Amino acid sequence: MLWITRFAGLFSAAMAVIVLSPSLQSFPPAAAIRSSPSPIFRKAPAVFNNGDECLSSGGVCNPSLVHVAITLDVEYLRGSIAAVNSILQHSVCPESVFFHFIAVSEETNLLESLVRSVFPRLKFNIYDFAPETVRGLISSSVRQALEQPLNYARSYLADLLEPCVNRVIYLDSDLVVVDDIAKLWKTSLGSRIIGAPEYCHANFTKYFTGGFWSEERFSGTFRGRKPCYFNTGVMVIDLKKWRRGGYTKRIEKWMEIQRRERIYELGSLPPFLLVFSGHVAPISHRWNQHGLGGDNVRGSCRDLHPGPVSLLHWSGSGKPWIRLDSKRPCPLDALWTPYDLYRHSH
């Protein structure tokens, strides 16, 4: 199969990069990024131009654009830059991809300048997300990263993005795309609000506490539907239907209940499961080879799931840039390396 041959070549090249780069350094903290006299990232090496078959693209409201939303923060910035780079490298029409970056207010100017220095011709807007929007709704989680306000920004895309943007692909920062993103964009949602790869054989009960399942007023929310697990790091969202149905308020309602009753442990995921599980347009699993970051505690190494691959996702506690810099990489981290634009000699 072509995808196997392609991945074998990519894997070999990436392993060579790791072996030949012994001086990998840890990604700098926010203070270092703000005070650095030289660029933290290299400029993207390629000029990304549309092919002849691509439609002309203009401003954010142009109907021919593919809209992609990603959060930006200094802790995961290296991952976000790699994700954007991967999308551009594999897009047939890279100039037709419009990026919507969500960042906390005090970092937007810094991050906007940085993105423009790496991708000078990139079409994007950056949006302020006020942490106060969700701070009073967030409860403690199994991993501190899951408690960060920006992790909840995906619930507010319908409010943050321009009203003319009626559909968006939401992507986490710890992934790379190895296929044309337009294929994911064209996914039919039918009557559904969101589309995502579903995993109906997963143990759904573990995502909620025993107290949740013992209370009919909570567990009854799944009556009449077949709930399946889905990972919220890769979603196609119909923003027009989301706005019309007030789905942000529905998610906030469950977050308020969680603050009082403690019905789950996993950050921003369970409210999405409560609102949408059983009502998700299924997308091929090739678009979210998730779990490559291991579990939420140890971050152990994982293998690829069987089948073709269009997107690699390091969900879990282990991130490829951290493991690479600490010289304790997992084998599959080599597949992330070709998209990394961080200046290792910095």
UniProtKB/Swiss-Prot annotation:
Keywords assigned by UniProt, alphabetized: Cell wall biogenesis/degradation, Glycoprotein, Glycosyltransferase, Golgi apparatus, Membrane, Signal-anchor, Transferase, Transmembrane, Transmembrane helix
Residue spans crossing the bilayer: 1-21
General function of this protein: May be involved in pectin and/or xylans biosynthesis in cell walls.
Listed GO biological process terms: cell wall organization; pectin biosynthetic process
Keyword Membrane: yes
First-listed, main subcellular location of the protein, grouped into a coarse class: Golgi
Phylogenetic placement of the source organism: Eukaryota, Viridiplantae, Streptophyta, Embryophyta, Tracheophyta
One GO term describing the cellular component: Golgi membrane
Record's subcellular location: Golgi apparatus membrane
Glycosylation site residues: 203
Topology, Lumenal side: 22-346
Top-rank taxon: Eukaryota
Family, similarity comment: Belongs to the glycosyltransferase 8 family.
Protein name stated in the entry: Probable galacturonosyltransferase-like 6
Membrane topology type: Single-pass type II membrane protein
Gene Ontology molecular functions: polygalacturonate 4-alpha-galacturonosyltransferase activity
Keyword Cell inner membrane on entry: no
Pathway(s) annotated for this protein in UniProt: Glycan metabolism; pectin biosynthesis
PANTHER family associated with the record: GALACTURONOSYLTRANSFERASE-LIKE 6-RELATED (PTHR13778:SF68), GLYCOSYLTRANSFERASE 8 DOMAIN-CONTAINING PROTEIN (PTHR13778)
EC number(s) given by UniProt: 2.4.1.-
Top enzyme category: transferase
